[in-house]
Amino acid sequence: MTRGKPGRAHKQAATGEHGLVIAAHGRHYLVERDGGGFLQCFPRGKRSECAVGDRVVYEATAVDQGVVVRVDERRNLLYRSDQFKSKVLAANLDQVIIMLGTEPSFSEDLLGRALVAAESLGITPLILLNKIDLTARLETARSRLALYRDLGYTIVELTVHGAPEAAHAALEPHVAGRASILIGQSGMGKSSLLNLLIPGVDAQTREISEKLDSGKHTTTFTRLYHLPADWGQGGMLIDSPGFQEFGLHHLSEGMLERAFPEFRPRLTECRFYNCRHLQEPGCGILGAMAEGKIDPRRHQLYAQLLHESEQQKPW
């Protein structure tokens, strides 16, 4: 990935065939050829610059291998980062689906960070609350999510195992015709959801793993699945490995303040043009929080992300 300017396409002229990156594992990429079939590809040069969802130009170097010579311009690039490194998730997305469950208890910090990541790129977020048949913790989960519902985020409640047909009917309108990435902690039901929406997903995953030479590491790579053709609208669903943290060290102060939708209308109310919304007098954000119009949890997340963005980054 090009550090500092993620999403920048290669500028050199290139000839070759066109395809779509449908899986990534390290510096190995599986490209779906526009003309049919698949090819394992490697990036040209030392730096890996491809992401699942990228449209690329490649040149075949063998019957089943090739080299990516150009990445087409991206609409967006979703990735996470910490103080030491960054991790590409996917490119050219319409939607970020955040999978939560009533049990085990979900991380509200990860949820908030995923929403900020989506907002910073102008990507629509969708929150799924799975396992609503486990009623012991359902009301607690709903209470924790009330803040996000009040902010205008769409929350779909379902139980993939207990009522698969109802879950399918609830999800299809949200995913059909869109490029979505599915993210979340382990144990929230992502695998069950994939099996519900993508017929034969296990066989597809094994095939992708074999073509990538990733062997037994079938849960450690990001992969793209086309939604069923009989839906009639196209669309794709990208599955990313489960993770427990979602660092956003790459987001600048200006990007962060605009990634909180409840902050945006109040940014012009600050007394100082360079207000950081931490302790400055006459701050529109702090004033709104004092009036109960901004939840302190959201401001706490903003302050933490701002602190992280100030850390020195070697990448």
Swiss-Prot record:
It is found in: Cytoplasm. Pfam families: RsgA_GTPase (PF03193). Coiled coil: none annotated. Its cofactor is Zn(2+). Keywords: Cytoplasm, GTP-binding, Hydrolase, Metal-binding, Nucleotide-binding, Ribosome biogenesis, RNA-binding, rRNA-binding, Zinc. GO terms for cellular component: cytoplasm. GTP binds at N130, K131, I132, D133, G184, Q185, S186, G187, M188, G189, K190, S191, S192. Zn(2+) binds at C270, C275, H277, C283. Binds 1 zinc ion per subunit. Residues 82-246 form the CP-type G domain. The keyword Acetylation does not apply. Its EC number is 3.6.1.-. It comes from the Bacteria. The keyword Cell wall biogenesis/degradation does not apply. It is an enzyme of class 3 (hydrolase). PROSITE patterns: ENGC_GTPASE (PS50936), G_CP (PS51721). GO terms for biological process: ribosomal small subunit biogenesis. One of its GO terms (molecular function) is GTP binding. Monomer. Associates with 30S ribosomal subunit, binds 16S rRNA. Belongs to the TRAFAC class YlqF/YawG GTPase family. RsgA subfamily. HAMAP family: GTPase_RsgA (MF_01820). One of several proteins that assist in the late maturation steps of the functional core of the 30S ribosomal subunit. Helps release RbfA from mature subunits. May play a role in the assembly of ribosomal proteins into the subunit. Circularly permuted GTPase that catalyzes slow GTP hydrolysis, GTPase activity is stimulated by the 30S ribosomal subunit. This is Small ribosomal subunit biogenesis GTPase RsgA. It comes from Ralstonia pickettii (strain 12J).
